A protein has these predicted regions:
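Surface-exposed, low-hydrophobicity beta-strand/loop segments enriched in small/polar/acidic residues
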Residues: 1-33, 398-428
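Extracellular, repeat-based ectodomains that mediate carbohydrate processing or recognition
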Residues: 27-399
Length: 428
């Protein structure tokens, strides 16, 4: 016997021919929000604007931000989320020796991150590949201009297509009618190269947009406000092929001016969740379920998750362990940080009553750390000199597992058996 067996208990046969008692393991947790952990607090400084990602190879979070105490230069802090909900940060690392207004950091597979940003010296957009080691990161050389034409970008967001092993950037081209443009990047070692650009919106886009990878359908989904259609909330589905991306038709999910987009993939239900600010409904914080089929997307009915005027930012990610997602945002009045927990059922959404996260901020970003099954939320703490801080959120769950399958049950133990001893079984 492999392990002790109690008389009368069901028994399985292992692949090596030994037998073991059927066991049941219950793994559970209750909802918990941690205190704040500082990643940038030098005297007279702090963090402006933040972007966070999770490196699933090294089990680290990486936070990109503007360091107020160093002329707003682009900086990255790497941290470890611990099982007790605390976060341990290493020494921040300079990523770009200038102060870009627009930037985004994304996990790029194989223990790498990519940080994309506005090139303030040469124009256009640039990026670097970061390699994480411990609670630190080192960067390769700056890439060539990903716009291909030196045009000014006004915002850049990124997603990683794990099927194609490519990074997709989406940006606004300020020199070409504020059109929405996408480009595919290929990481090789510590460098990244880009293919040709593709427009996903040719009549201008609004001030925010977001994109995420649907791993069930191997598609990139971009949410944006369509300037050619009254800035309605819209999505397009993109397919990456080597160094290019193509898009299906535009699909409207909100027939009103929509802003502050955030999007994630719900791997429990194989759905996209899009959060946004609905200006047609008193600027309420709203979300909708999207179902991808081929290069098209259809929607359920939008659900309000906060009946108050929200600031120009939301962030969202999904907890694959608890099967739920969390949205974070700040209120327009007072910049109070809030969060809500969402559940998908078919194409419908339901939310818990929104709760205070703690502190105030103009901008927050959230990511799920699958190593410890907790969310990490980074923000500029308006309550404390814009210090860069992060908190963790642990969702409640109750998961039961056992070692019994439809094929390995062999019978019941006749007598109590010690570990390593022979067992006699009743098989009928």
């Amino acid at each position: 016997a492999s392990g002790a067996i109690t008389a009368g208990k069901p028994v399985i046969v292992n692949s090596n021919g030994t037998v073991a008692q059927v066991f049941e393991n219950v793994d559970s947790a209750t909802l918990a929000v941690s205190g704040s952990y500082t990643f940038e607090s030098a005297a007279g400084s702090g963090a402006l604007y933040v972007s966070i990602c999770f490196d699933s190879v090294n089990n680290k979070i990486a936070i990109a931000y503007q360091d107020i105490g160093n002329s707003n230069k682009l900086t990255v802090a790497v941290g470890t989320v611990n099982t007790n909900g605390s976060i341990t940060f290493g020494t921040p690392v300079l990523a770009y020796n200038a102060s870009p207004t627009y930037f985004h950091i994304v996990y790029a597979g194989s223990g790498k991150v990519v940080i994309a940003y506005q090139d303030t010296s040469a124009g256009g957009g640039a990026s670097k590949v970061g390699t994480i080691s411990g609670n630190s990161v080192s960067f390769g050389s700056q890439s060539s201009d990903f716009t291909g034409n030196g045009n000014t970008i006004q915002g850049v967001y990124a997603a990683y297509d794990s099927n194609a092993d490519r990074v997709v950037l989406a940006y606004k081209d300020a020199n070409d009618g504020d059109d929405g443009v996408a480009v595919v990047g290929t990481v090789s070692g510590t460098s990244i190269s880009y293919g040709s650009t593709t427009k996903f919106a040719s009549s201008g886009i609004g001030t925010t947009w977001d994109l995420h990878f649907d791993s069930s359908n191997n598609k990139i989904v971009i949410a944006y406000s369509d300037g050619g259609n009254n800035y309605y909330g819209t999505c397009k589905v993109g397919t990456v092929s080597d160094t290019s991306i193509s898009f299906g038709s535009a699909a409207v999910f909100e027939s009103a001016d929509s802003r502050a987009f955030a999007i994630c993939f719900d791997s429990t239900n194989n759905k996209m969740i899009i959060a946004y600010k609905d200006t047609g409904n008193s600027n309420y914080a709203t979300a909708v379920v999207g179902t991808v089929s081929g290069t098209s997307i259809s929607y359920g009915t939008p659900a309000v998750f906060n009946s108050a005027n929200t600031y120009e930012d939301h962030s969202i990610d999904h907890d694959s362990n608890a099967g739920k997602h969390v949205i974070v945002w700040s209120l327009q009045s007072g910049l109070t940080n809030k969060y809500a927990i969402g559940t998908v059922s078919g194409t419908s959404l339901s939310y818990t009553t929104s709760a205070n996260l703690g502190d105030t901020a103009e901008q927050l970003d959230i990511v799920f750390d699958s190593n410890v099954n907790k969310f990490a939320v980074a923000y500029d703490n308006e309550s404390s000199s814009n210090n860069g801080v992060a908190r963790t959120i642990q969702l409640a769950y109750n998961n039961t597992t056992n070692n019994l399958t439809s094929e390995n049950f062999i019978g019941f133990a006749k007598d109590a058996v010690a570990d390593g001893a022979s067992a006699t079984l009743h098989t009928a």
